[in-house]
Protein backbone atom coordinates (compact mmCIF):
# COMPACT_ATOMS: atom_id res chain seq x y z
CA UNK A 1 0.00 0.00 0.00
CA UNK A 2 2.84 2.36 0.94
CA UNK A 3 4.57 1.57 -2.34
CA UNK A 4 1.38 2.33 -4.27
CA UNK A 5 1.03 5.68 -2.49
CA UNK A 6 4.64 6.54 -3.32
CA UNK A 7 4.02 5.76 -6.98
CA UNK A 8 0.87 7.89 -7.02
CA UNK A 9 2.67 10.81 -5.36
CA UNK A 10 5.51 10.52 -7.85
CA UNK A 11 3.09 10.54 -10.76
CA UNK A 12 1.31 13.60 -9.35
CA UNK A 13 4.59 15.46 -8.92
CA UNK A 14 5.75 14.55 -12.40
CA UNK A 15 2.36 15.52 -13.79
CA UNK A 16 2.44 18.92 -12.09
CA UNK A 17 5.98 19.48 -13.26
CA UNK A 18 5.08 18.57 -16.83
CA UNK A 19 2.10 20.94 -16.85
CA UNK A 20 4.26 23.80 -15.65
CA UNK A 21 6.94 22.97 -18.21
CA UNK A 22 4.45 22.89 -21.06
CA UNK A 23 2.90 26.17 -19.88
CA UNK A 24 6.30 27.89 -19.79
CA UNK A 25 7.17 26.53 -23.23
CA UNK A 26 3.85 27.78 -24.59
CA UNK A 27 4.34 31.24 -23.10
CA UNK A 28 7.90 31.55 -24.36
CA UNK A 29 6.85 30.19 -27.73
CA UNK A 30 4.17 32.85 -28.25
CA UNK A 31 6.62 35.75 -27.97
CA UNK A 32 9.33 33.78 -29.72
CA UNK A 33 6.99 33.20 -32.66
CA UNK A 34 6.58 36.96 -33.09
CA UNK A 35 10.34 37.52 -32.82
CA UNK A 36 11.14 34.82 -35.35
CA UNK A 37 8.48 36.13 -37.73
CA UNK A 38 10.08 39.56 -37.51
CA UNK A 39 6.95 41.69 -37.15
CA UNK A 40 3.76 42.13 -35.13
CA UNK A 41 0.38 41.41 -36.73
CA UNK A 42 -2.15 43.93 -35.47
CA UNK A 43 -5.90 43.91 -36.12
CA UNK A 44 -7.40 47.40 -36.53
CA UNK A 45 -10.55 49.09 -37.79
CA UNK A 46 -10.65 49.13 -41.58
CA UNK A 47 -11.88 52.71 -41.79
CA UNK A 48 -12.04 54.92 -38.71
CA UNK A 49 -10.04 58.09 -39.47
CA UNK A 50 -8.23 59.34 -36.40
CA UNK A 51 -7.95 55.83 -34.97
CA UNK A 52 -7.06 53.61 -37.92
CA UNK A 53 -7.34 54.32 -41.63
CA UNK A 54 -5.24 54.11 -44.78
CA UNK A 55 -4.32 57.00 -47.05
CA UNK A 56 -4.26 56.80 -50.85
CA UNK A 57 -0.79 55.26 -50.73
CA UNK A 58 -1.89 52.53 -48.34
CA UNK A 59 -0.13 53.99 -45.31
CA UNK A 60 -1.91 53.47 -41.99
CA UNK A 61 -2.34 56.18 -39.35
CA UNK A 62 -4.36 56.81 -36.20
CA UNK A 63 -4.33 56.44 -32.43
CA UNK A 64 -4.71 52.65 -32.54
CA UNK A 65 -2.20 52.43 -35.38
CA UNK A 66 0.31 54.35 -33.26
CA UNK A 67 -0.25 51.88 -30.45
CA UNK A 68 0.55 48.94 -32.73
CA UNK A 69 3.67 50.73 -33.94
CA UNK A 70 4.67 51.29 -30.31
CA UNK A 71 4.38 47.56 -29.60
CA UNK A 72 6.63 46.86 -32.59
CA UNK A 73 9.12 49.49 -31.45
CA UNK A 74 9.22 47.92 -27.99
CA UNK A 75 9.85 44.40 -29.29
CA UNK A 76 12.04 45.04 -32.33
CA UNK A 77 13.35 48.57 -31.85
CA UNK A 78 11.62 49.41 -35.14
CA UNK A 79 8.07 50.78 -35.26
CA UNK A 80 7.70 49.76 -38.91
CA UNK A 81 7.85 46.06 -38.01
CA UNK A 82 4.08 45.70 -37.97
CA UNK A 83 1.51 44.33 -40.39
CA UNK A 84 -1.99 45.80 -40.17
CA UNK A 85 -5.10 43.73 -40.79
CA UNK A 86 -8.28 45.74 -41.34
CA UNK A 87 -11.27 44.12 -39.62
CA UNK A 88 -14.96 44.89 -39.28
CA UNK A 89 -16.85 44.38 -36.01
CA UNK A 90 -17.93 40.81 -36.78
CA UNK A 91 -14.45 39.73 -37.92
CA UNK A 92 -12.38 41.04 -35.02
CA UNK A 93 -13.01 38.43 -32.31
CA UNK A 94 -12.83 35.26 -34.47
CA UNK A 95 -9.63 36.60 -36.05
CA UNK A 96 -8.02 37.19 -32.65
CA UNK A 97 -9.24 33.86 -31.25
CA UNK A 98 -7.83 31.98 -34.25
CA UNK A 99 -4.35 33.39 -33.70
CA UNK A 100 -4.24 35.11 -37.08
CA UNK A 101 -3.35 38.39 -35.34
CA UNK A 102 -1.17 39.01 -32.28
CA UNK A 103 -2.99 42.07 -30.96
CA UNK A 104 -6.43 43.58 -31.55
CA UNK A 105 -6.38 47.39 -31.29
CA UNK A 106 -9.73 48.22 -32.84
CA UNK A 107 -11.85 50.61 -30.73
CA UNK A 108 -13.12 47.66 -28.70
CA UNK A 109 -15.03 48.08 -25.43
CA UNK A 110 -13.82 46.22 -22.35
CA UNK A 111 -16.77 44.20 -21.00
CA UNK A 112 -17.15 41.20 -18.70
CA UNK A 113 -18.49 38.95 -21.48
CA UNK A 114 -15.50 39.66 -23.71
CA UNK A 115 -13.12 39.28 -20.80
CA UNK A 116 -14.61 36.01 -19.52
CA UNK A 117 -16.76 34.29 -22.15
CA UNK A 118 -14.54 35.06 -25.13
CA UNK A 119 -11.37 34.42 -23.10
CA UNK A 120 -9.56 37.60 -24.09
CA UNK A 121 -7.30 39.78 -21.96
CA UNK A 122 -7.64 43.54 -22.21
CA UNK A 123 -4.27 45.21 -21.76
CA UNK A 124 -5.63 48.55 -20.59
CA UNK A 125 -7.77 51.44 -21.81
CA UNK A 126 -6.25 53.72 -24.43
CA UNK A 127 -9.42 55.75 -25.00
CA UNK A 128 -12.33 56.45 -22.64
CA UNK A 129 -15.46 56.96 -24.71
CA UNK A 130 -19.25 56.86 -24.58
CA UNK A 131 -22.03 56.20 -27.09
CA UNK A 132 -23.82 59.11 -28.74
CA UNK A 133 -25.98 60.04 -31.73
CA UNK A 134 -25.11 61.87 -34.97
CA UNK A 135 -27.96 63.50 -36.91
CA UNK A 136 -28.42 66.07 -39.70
CA UNK A 137 -29.19 69.56 -38.41
CA UNK A 138 -32.26 69.84 -40.64
CA UNK A 139 -34.07 67.28 -38.46
CA UNK A 140 -34.29 70.06 -35.88
CA UNK A 141 -33.88 67.60 -33.00
CA UNK A 142 -32.18 68.80 -29.82
CA UNK A 143 -32.23 65.65 -27.70
CA UNK A 144 -31.97 61.89 -28.14
CA UNK A 145 -35.29 61.59 -26.30
CA UNK A 146 -36.92 62.96 -29.48
CA UNK A 147 -35.76 60.04 -31.64
CA UNK A 148 -38.89 57.89 -31.28
CA UNK A 149 -39.59 56.13 -34.58
CA UNK A 150 -36.20 57.02 -36.10
CA UNK A 151 -34.33 54.89 -38.62
CA UNK A 152 -31.04 54.23 -36.85
CA UNK A 153 -27.80 53.10 -38.47
CA UNK A 154 -26.21 50.60 -36.08
CA UNK A 155 -23.46 47.99 -36.32
CA UNK A 156 -24.75 44.54 -35.42
CA UNK A 157 -23.24 42.45 -32.60
CA UNK A 158 -21.68 45.42 -30.81
CA UNK A 159 -22.11 47.03 -27.40
CA UNK A 160 -23.64 49.95 -29.32
CA UNK A 161 -26.57 47.76 -30.39
CA UNK A 162 -27.15 46.56 -26.81
CA UNK A 163 -26.93 50.09 -25.41
CA UNK A 164 -29.35 51.37 -28.06
CA UNK A 165 -31.92 48.71 -27.16
CA UNK A 166 -31.65 49.58 -23.47
CA UNK A 167 -31.86 53.34 -24.02
CA UNK A 168 -34.93 53.23 -26.25
CA UNK A 169 -36.72 50.75 -23.96
CA UNK A 170 -36.00 52.86 -20.87
CA UNK A 171 -37.39 55.94 -22.63
CA UNK A 172 -40.46 54.16 -24.05
CA UNK A 173 -39.35 54.73 -27.63
CA UNK A 174 -39.12 52.53 -30.71
CA UNK A 175 -36.67 52.60 -33.59
CA UNK A 176 -36.12 50.93 -36.93
CA UNK A 177 -32.59 49.44 -37.18
CA UNK A 178 -30.58 49.87 -40.35
CA UNK A 179 -27.67 47.46 -39.93
CA UNK A 180 -24.29 48.52 -41.27
CA UNK A 181 -20.94 46.75 -41.67
CA UNK A 182 -18.84 49.55 -40.23
CA UNK A 183 -18.22 53.27 -40.23
CA UNK A 184 -17.76 53.54 -43.99
CA UNK A 185 -21.07 51.80 -44.65
CA UNK A 186 -22.76 53.83 -41.89
CA UNK A 187 -21.57 57.13 -43.35
CA UNK A 188 -22.79 56.16 -46.81
CA UNK A 189 -26.26 55.29 -45.52
CA UNK A 190 -26.47 58.31 -43.20
CA UNK A 191 -25.31 60.85 -45.76
CA UNK A 192 -27.65 59.41 -48.42
CA UNK A 193 -30.63 59.71 -46.07
CA UNK A 194 -31.24 55.98 -45.70
CA UNK A 195 -31.13 56.42 -41.93
CA UNK A 196 -31.99 59.41 -39.73
CA UNK A 197 -29.30 58.88 -37.15
CA UNK A 198 -26.03 57.04 -36.66
CA UNK A 199 -25.11 55.77 -33.21
CA UNK A 200 -21.72 54.53 -32.03
CA UNK A 201 -18.90 55.71 -29.78
CA UNK A 202 -18.69 59.51 -29.72
CA UNK A 203 -15.17 59.37 -31.16
CA UNK A 204 -16.53 57.39 -34.12
CA UNK A 205 -19.26 59.99 -34.60
CA UNK A 206 -16.63 62.74 -34.64
CA UNK A 207 -14.73 60.76 -37.27
CA UNK A 208 -17.90 60.31 -39.37
CA UNK A 209 -18.85 63.99 -39.08
CA UNK A 210 -15.35 65.05 -40.13
CA UNK A 211 -15.78 62.98 -43.30
CA UNK A 212 -19.00 64.73 -44.35
CA UNK A 213 -18.97 67.07 -47.35
CA UNK A 214 -20.16 69.84 -45.02
CA UNK A 215 -19.59 68.90 -41.34
CA UNK A 216 -21.59 71.95 -40.20
CA UNK A 217 -24.77 70.23 -41.41
CA UNK A 218 -24.33 67.45 -38.85
CA UNK A 219 -24.45 67.53 -35.06
CA UNK A 220 -23.77 65.11 -32.24
CA UNK A 221 -26.64 65.18 -29.73
CA UNK A 222 -25.71 65.99 -26.11
CA UNK A 223 -26.68 62.63 -24.59
CA UNK A 224 -23.92 60.10 -23.90
CA UNK A 225 -25.74 56.89 -23.05
CA UNK A 226 -22.94 54.52 -22.03
CA UNK A 227 -19.42 53.97 -20.76
CA UNK A 228 -17.08 52.69 -23.47
CA UNK A 229 -13.56 51.98 -22.18
CA UNK A 230 -11.74 51.11 -25.39
CA UNK A 231 -8.47 49.25 -25.44
CA UNK A 232 -6.16 46.68 -27.01
CA UNK A 233 -6.50 42.99 -26.24
CA UNK A 234 -4.81 39.63 -26.71
CA UNK A 235 -5.84 36.02 -26.17
CA UNK A 236 -5.89 34.58 -22.66
CA UNK A 237 -2.93 32.35 -21.86
CA UNK A 238 -0.67 34.74 -23.77
CA UNK A 239 1.00 36.22 -20.67
CA UNK A 240 4.25 37.45 -22.19
CA UNK A 241 2.61 39.13 -25.12
CA UNK A 242 -0.08 40.54 -22.84
CA UNK A 243 2.59 42.03 -20.55
CA UNK A 244 4.38 43.69 -23.47
CA UNK A 245 1.14 45.14 -24.85
CA UNK A 246 0.03 46.35 -21.40
CA UNK A 247 3.37 47.95 -20.52
CA UNK A 248 3.64 49.58 -23.94
CA UNK A 249 0.50 51.52 -23.01
CA UNK A 250 1.78 52.19 -19.48
CA UNK A 251 5.12 53.44 -20.82
CA UNK A 252 3.39 55.95 -23.12
CA UNK A 253 1.27 57.32 -20.24
CA UNK A 254 4.16 57.40 -17.77
CA UNK A 255 6.37 59.14 -20.33
CA UNK A 256 3.81 61.91 -20.81
CA UNK A 257 3.52 62.28 -17.05
CA UNK A 258 7.31 62.53 -16.77
CA UNK A 259 7.55 65.08 -19.59
CA UNK A 260 9.39 62.75 -21.99
CA UNK A 261 8.58 63.34 -25.66
CA UNK A 262 9.86 61.99 -28.95
CA UNK A 263 11.69 65.30 -29.37
CA UNK A 264 13.49 65.49 -26.02
CA UNK A 265 13.96 61.77 -25.31
CA UNK A 266 17.70 61.79 -26.08
CA UNK A 267 18.28 64.73 -23.78
CA UNK A 268 16.24 63.00 -21.06
CA UNK A 269 18.66 60.06 -21.05
CA UNK A 270 20.88 62.12 -18.73
CA UNK A 271 18.03 63.35 -16.49
CA UNK A 272 18.46 63.00 -12.72
CA UNK A 273 14.99 61.53 -12.22
CA UNK A 274 15.11 57.83 -11.35
CA UNK A 275 11.65 57.38 -12.86
CA UNK A 276 12.81 58.83 -16.18
CA UNK A 277 15.87 56.58 -16.15
CA UNK A 278 13.71 53.51 -15.54
CA UNK A 279 11.25 54.47 -18.30
CA UNK A 280 14.08 54.87 -20.81
CA UNK A 281 16.05 51.81 -19.71
CA UNK A 282 19.05 53.74 -18.39
CA UNK A 283 18.49 52.02 -15.04
CA UNK A 284 16.57 48.92 -14.07
CA UNK A 285 15.61 45.96 -16.22
CA UNK A 286 12.13 46.75 -17.51
CA UNK A 287 12.82 45.49 -21.04
CA UNK A 288 14.50 42.22 -20.05
CA UNK A 289 11.71 41.50 -17.56
CA UNK A 290 9.35 41.58 -20.55
CA UNK A 291 11.63 39.43 -22.68
CA UNK A 292 12.86 42.30 -24.88
CA UNK A 293 15.79 44.74 -24.93
CA UNK A 294 16.87 47.39 -22.43
CA UNK A 295 15.70 50.17 -24.78
CA UNK A 296 12.06 49.05 -24.67
CA UNK A 297 10.75 52.38 -23.35
CA UNK A 298 13.26 54.54 -25.20
CA UNK A 299 12.39 53.04 -28.58
CA UNK A 300 8.65 53.46 -28.00
CA UNK A 301 8.95 57.16 -27.14
CA UNK A 302 11.66 57.95 -29.70
CA UNK A 303 9.74 56.43 -32.60
CA UNK A 304 6.07 56.92 -31.67
CA UNK A 305 5.95 59.43 -28.82
CA UNK A 306 4.08 59.55 -25.53
CA UNK A 307 0.31 59.12 -25.25
CA UNK A 308 -0.40 62.86 -25.37
CA UNK A 309 1.64 63.28 -28.55
CA UNK A 310 -0.24 60.44 -30.23
CA UNK A 311 -3.60 61.87 -29.11
CA UNK A 312 -2.83 65.38 -30.38
CA UNK A 313 -1.45 64.09 -33.67
CA UNK A 314 -4.41 61.87 -34.51
CA UNK A 315 -7.60 63.09 -32.83
CA UNK A 316 -6.76 66.32 -30.97
CA UNK A 317 -8.14 69.86 -31.38
CA UNK A 318 -5.98 70.59 -34.44
CA UNK A 319 -7.16 67.53 -36.38
CA UNK A 320 -10.40 67.05 -38.36
CA UNK A 321 -11.91 65.20 -35.35
CA UNK A 322 -11.11 68.16 -33.05
CA UNK A 323 -11.49 66.11 -29.85
CA UNK A 324 -10.54 67.51 -26.46
CA UNK A 325 -8.59 65.33 -24.03
CA UNK A 326 -11.45 65.19 -21.49
CA UNK A 327 -11.38 61.88 -19.63
CA UNK A 328 -8.32 60.92 -21.67
CA UNK A 329 -6.18 63.53 -20.00
CA UNK A 330 -3.67 62.60 -17.32
CA UNK A 331 -5.11 62.18 -13.83
CA UNK A 332 -3.20 65.24 -12.63
CA UNK A 333 -4.79 67.32 -15.41
CA UNK A 334 -8.40 66.39 -14.65
CA UNK A 335 -8.62 63.16 -16.65
CA UNK A 336 -8.59 59.49 -15.66
CA UNK A 337 -5.39 58.33 -17.38
CA UNK A 338 -3.65 56.81 -14.36
CA UNK A 339 -1.35 53.81 -14.73
CA UNK A 340 1.06 51.81 -12.54
CA UNK A 341 4.54 53.27 -12.02
CA UNK A 342 7.70 51.90 -13.62
CA UNK A 343 9.35 50.05 -10.71
Would you name each region that the model predicts?
Residues 17-25, 66-69, 73-75, 138-141, ...:
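Extended ligand-binding regions for polar small-molecule ligands
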Residues 41-50, 60-75, 129-185:
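Bilobed "Venus flytrap"/periplasmic-binding protein-like clamshell domains
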Residues 12-15:
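C-terminal motif of bacterial Sec signal peptides marking the signal peptidase cleavage site
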Residues 2-8:
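Sec-dependent signal peptide recognition
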Residues 69, 73, 77-146, 203-224, ...:
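Acidic, polar ligand-binding/catalytic clefts
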Residues 23-105, 330, 334:
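Extracytoplasmic small-molecule ligand-binding "clamshell" domains
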Residues 280-343:
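C-terminal functional modules
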Residues 30, 67-68, 91-96, 183-189, ...:
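Short, hydrophobic alpha-helical packing/hinge segments within bilobed ligand-binding/sensory domains
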